[in-house]
Amino acid sequence: SYYELLRDHISNFTEESLQYLSQEAGFSLLESRVINRDTIEFVLQKEAKENLSIFRYSGQKIDISPLLENEKEIQEDIEAHIAKLKEKGERIAIWGASHQGLTLLSTTALKEVVSYIIDSAPFKQGLYSPASHVLIVPPEHFQEEPVDEILIVAPGYTDEIAGIIKRDFQPCPRILALRGERITEL
């Protein structure tokens, strides 16, 4: 998804470009895998220059048009969802002051309607999100300022967070998650 291409990170890599960079820095690749659908994990070992293999990428340049299409689809889905919220006079919060959530807030119309960001990490609470300037609050804040729905934007923790909301939030708001390029109700 486009929201994984982080504007606040200095570099984003493909497996091939990261392998090339690692070898240029004097490391050999022992193991490579993709975790959480989009994070490249490498196990590297420092090598003497003469022991390094030469990496040559023979593939094609990367076509980013699917990434751009994904961004467009997410933008359109979010705008349609916001229109329905406004029509009903309802309020939304998001759960997750993560890179995905902060990217979505800073690049979509969500920043105009989100009441607050819930995050259970104490070091984030009381701060404001970059670019969108939305307050980050602890989960207990919901009891002081209930919203009609919560959009979970912490993909690795969606089920866990949904369970917390169902267990602890009364009245229970609608629980949503961004799956692919669509907002879905859980």
Show which residues each predicted segment covers.
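Aromatic-acidic/polar surface patches that form glycan- and anion
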Residues: S11, R33, E71
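Hydrophobic, well-ordered beta-alpha structural blocks that scaffold small-molecule cofactor pockets
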Residues: V43-L186
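Short, glycine-/aromatic-enriched active-site segment of Class I SAM-dependent methyltransferases
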Residues: S1-S11, E15-S17
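Extracellular glycan-modifying ectodomains
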Residues: E4-L5, Y20-Q23, L44, I183-L186
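Conserved S-adenosyl-L-methionine
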Residues: F27-R37
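Structured core elements
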Residues: N12, L29-E31, V43, A93-I94
